[in-house]
Amino acid sequence: MKMKILIIFLFFTGIIFISYVKSNKEEINYTIIGEKELFSSNIISKNFSDLIYDELSKKNNFGFYSKEFTYKNIRTIDMINNINNNVNIDNIYIQNILKRTNVLIINTGNNEINYKLSKVDSNENNDNEIYNYLDEVYKDIKVLIEKVKDLNEGKIIFLGIYNDTGNKDNDKYYKYINEKLKLLMHSNDIDYLNLFYVLNKNEDYLTKGNNIYITNEGNIAIFNKLYRKIDQLYLHKQL
């Protein structure tokens, strides 16, 4: 009889302990900031960021998903100014969101780089001008990372720059900036997903023609890479 009571006691104690651990897990607060163009094309059914939300929202300790601070045609310097000025959308302040977020994706750099390359022909005569411009974008991103790190102590993933100019001659510039950014993120303990290489693996990941967009297949490929990183960097540490 005493043994039965002991077994029942241990059983319910175990249930209470498991419930306590689950209820005291840190909330998963997921945010993406930066450029909206990467995932706003009307040719896709669901973008990679929303696919991540779909998976994270199934967790008992899911908190929030913020994509308020993604914009069309935003530059890195604009993002820096937004943080400095603590801009708000419907009384949601960017500094507060960054402080509360523990899974953060940053997407910036594509707008200004692709705009520059669309205005300047890719040839040896223009190489210096283009590389100098890439270095300036890099400096802005470095400042942005410093601002974000001052506010955020969570896991951060930076999305690399991909070639949406439709011109393969520009690949050398994307390889150059991605290598610099990869080293920068590594030195700041930020994970890096190089979209240039991810999207170049399959011709179905990008549309054809002058206006290049990421397809459904491309978004799923990015989602798979990102969610695996989120699982490795954050989710499994909560077990």
Listing of model-derived features with the role each one plays in the protein:
Residues N88-L239:
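Alpha-helical cap/lid subdomain in secreted, periplasmic
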Residues M1-I5:
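Positively charged n-region of N-terminal signal peptides that target proteins for export
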Residues I18-E26:
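Sec-dependent signal peptide cleavage junction
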Residues I28-T31, E37-E124, N128-K139:
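Conserved SGNH/GDSL esterase-like catalytic core that processes O-acyl groups on lipids
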Residues I15-I16, L51, A221, K225:
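Short amphipathic alpha-helical face segments that pack within enzyme cores
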Residues K25-E27, G154-K155:
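Short hydrophobic/aromatic-rich motifs at helix boundaries and adjacent loops
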Residues L6-S19:
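Hydrophobic membrane-insertion alpha-helices, especially the h-region
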